[in-house]
Amino acid sequence: MSGNRGVVYLGSGKVEVQKIDYPKMQDPRGKKIEHGVILKVVSTNICGSDQHMVRGRTTAQVGLVLGHEITGEVIEKGRDVENLQIGDLVSVPFNVACGRCRSCKEMHTGVCLTVNPARAGGAYGYVDMGDWTGGQAEYLLVPYADFNLLKLPDRDKAMEKIRDLTCLSDILPTGYHGAVTAGVGPGSTVYVAGAGPVGLAAAASARLLGAAVVIVGDLNPARLAHAKAQGFEIADLSLDTPLHEQIAALLGEPEVDCAVDAVGFEARGHGHEGAKHEAPATVLNSLMQVTRVAGKIGIPGLYVTEDPGAVDAAAKIGSLSIRFGLGWAKSHSFHTGQTPVMKYNRALMQAIMWDRINIAEVVGVQVISLDDAPRGYGEFDAGVPKKFVIDPHKTFSAA
């Protein structure tokens, strides 16, 4: 077997499905490995993090094969793989992790110390994350397979819920991580900034964790309408009514117990005029304002160290005008960084299989073909309330 196709980044605003190399049992530096498997990709999703690159807001190089949200079938394995068999259906955490370093042993798999020579942390198909080939493709190599992969135990039942299980690679654990690190528990009042897929996953996770009320804020009316239809309260950030007043109208007080930033560095201002302009510190500053004293703020939204398209010189190197003094005065706790998917994915798999969470409906999963990926990128960038899931082999599109 030698054919393969994938979604390739061709520069700002452009992706294309091209022929790419069939995966080999070797790492990005050409070293042969025996701890990996080759997957036939069953599903692979378009993520907001991919959009940051496609918009030209990172230093991603032309020719990068995109995609880090992957579910697949094991079709080849190295000699050192002991716990997986040919034919197994597996969920792939977006983190590439060795399982051997200090970070991995402490389950900080988002900052593995060995898989990326440039910095801590690796991922598939992402800028500065170790040059691991992306999974928006027909076939993919996964290293350290015994450690990284989550086997889906009942293939037939898993395929019945593949639209939900495909979210286990990233957005559901990422949203859940945001809710957990924000301290969400039974009876919590929660504000989630961002009604995209990660924000909705955070909102659904907060509900799973027992939150009394979840408010989702956004500028996009279609996404707000979708969030409302899923049973969440909403805050329309395009209005001139300040966020704390909208929260007070819902809760009777202007603050929440817990807050989640599911927007990240491409945030825009609030209000009729503010929404017209990018203002990368907006979300963090607003969360400090509306989170009660001693509250927690989870920050799964992506922030970068290099942003070529930033609004000013400071933001180009990830330096933002944050009112940290306000957070200090209110004794806030902040939690940032890449989600350690493996910390949560098995429990969330069970929640899906036992109908405790219907994440595909919440985030608006729409299945498309690999050839339709460029269209999916365009529509997602336009702000439609959908989560595009690519089915490269037409395995379940008609299911």
UniProtKB/Swiss-Prot annotation:
Keywords: Metal-binding, NAD, Oxidoreductase, Zinc. The gene is fdhA. InterPro entries: ADH-like_N (IPR013154), ADH_Zn_CS (IPR002328), AlaDH/PNT_NAD(H)-bd (IPR007698), GroES-like_sf (IPR011032), HCHO_DH_non_GSH (IPR014184), NAD(P)-bd_dom_sf (IPR036291). It catalyses: formaldehyde + NAD(+) + H2O = formate + NADH + 2 H(+); acetaldehyde + NAD(+) + H2O = acetate + NADH + 2 H(+); 2 formaldehyde + H2O = methanol + formate + H(+). Coiled coil: none annotated. Belongs to the zinc-containing alcohol dehydrogenase family. Dehydrogenase that catalyzes the NAD(+)-dependent oxidation of formaldehyde and acetaldehyde, and, to a lesser extent, long-chain alcohols, but is inactive against propionaldehyde, butyraldehyde, methanol and ethanol. Can also catalyze the dismutation of a wide range of aldehydes such as formaldehyde. This is Glutathione-independent formaldehyde dehydrogenase. Transmembrane segments: none annotated. Binds 2 Zn(2+) ions per subunit. It comes from the Bacteria. Its EC number is 1.2.1.46, 1.2.98.1. Gene3D superfamilies: Medium-chain alcohol dehydrogenases, catalytic domain, NAD(P)-binding Rossmann-like Domain. Zn(2+) 1 binds at residues 47, 68, 170. Thermostable up to 60 degrees Celsius. Homotetramer. GO terms for molecular function: acetaldehyde dehydrogenase (NAD+) activity; formaldehyde dehydrogenase (NAD+) activity; formaldehyde dismutase activity; zinc ion binding. Optimum pH is 8.9. Active from pH 5 to 10. It comes from Pseudomonas putida.
